[in-house]
Regions:
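Transmembrane alpha-helical insertion/packing segments
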Residues: 2-67
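Short, charged juxtamembrane terminal tails flanking transmembrane helices
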Residues: 4-14, 174-185
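Alpha-helical transmembrane spans of integral membrane proteins, capturing the lipid-embedded, hydrophobic core
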Residues: 21-33, 53, 84, 88, ...
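Juxtamembrane membrane-interface segments at transmembrane alpha-helix termini
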Residues: 60-71, 91, 123-127
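Membrane-helix interface/capping segments
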Residues: 64-80, 104
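C-terminal halves and exits of single transmembrane alpha-helices
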Residues: 87-113
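Membrane-interface interhelical loops and short interface/amphipathic helices
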Residues: 106-145
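Individual transmembrane alpha-helix segments
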Residues: 139-164
Length: 185
């Protein structure tokens, strides 16, 4: 049974949108957890980067499924933007929780060693280019001293910010109006 948006009040439509976004936020957070795990445990592989770069495609795919299955193929830019933003928001919350658990209970210094190795690599490149590396060192040292909760919160805010920006083109690409659907027939 389909529930069409034009049969609902604004409050009902928002409840529906948020319910789908929560489910799809779970899917996105699983992609991010796999990406994070791959980046930590198999850093020479491109799997972690590929999964991270698949983020906008996963959200767009889920938005198109929401549009098709719940809204009869019609979605406005505004509703698509809200759906995308809520999906990123819920995924960020779940990923923050997963990262906190990792940093608090599972990390034995692997994340810090990866940051230190990255600093050495970047420092060599910067020095070869004649750029001062002190600011990079200070930034990495600050990150290393953060507590698990602070580090998880930092990543959550970054994900929400990037998700807000990525929601704009995703909503623009995935929106469909009634007239557009009639033109396709």
């Amino acid at each position: 049974m389909r529930i069409f948006a034009f049969d609902m009040t604004f409050a009902d439509a928002l409840i529906q949108l948020r319910a789908f976004a929560r489910q799809d936020g779970l899917i996105l957070s699983l992609v991010w957890v796999c990406s994070f795990a791959a980046a930590l445990y198999i850093p020479q592989s491109e799997i972690g980067s590929f999964l991270a770069l698949s983020t906008p495609f996963v959200v767009a795919w889920r938005l198109m499924q929401f549009r098709k299955n719940a809204l009869d193929g019609i979605i406005s830019f505004r509703r698509g933007l809200a759906y995308s933003w809520f999906t990123f928001f819920y995924a960020s919350l779940l990923f923050c929780l997963a990262q906190y658990i990792y940093f608090r209970f599972l990390d034995t210094g692997l994340f810090r060693s990866i940051l230190s190795n990255a600093l050495q690599t970047v420092s060599e490149v910067y020095q070869a280019s004649g750029i001062d590396t002190q600011e990079s060192r200070n930034t990495i040292e600050e990150l290393i001293t953060l507590k698990p909760m602070q580090l998880s919160f930092l990543f959550m805010m970054q994900n929400i910010f990037i998700g807000t920006i990525m929601s704009l083109p995703i909503a623009a690409i995935c929106m469909r109006s009634n007239s557009h659907q009639q033109n396709l027939i």
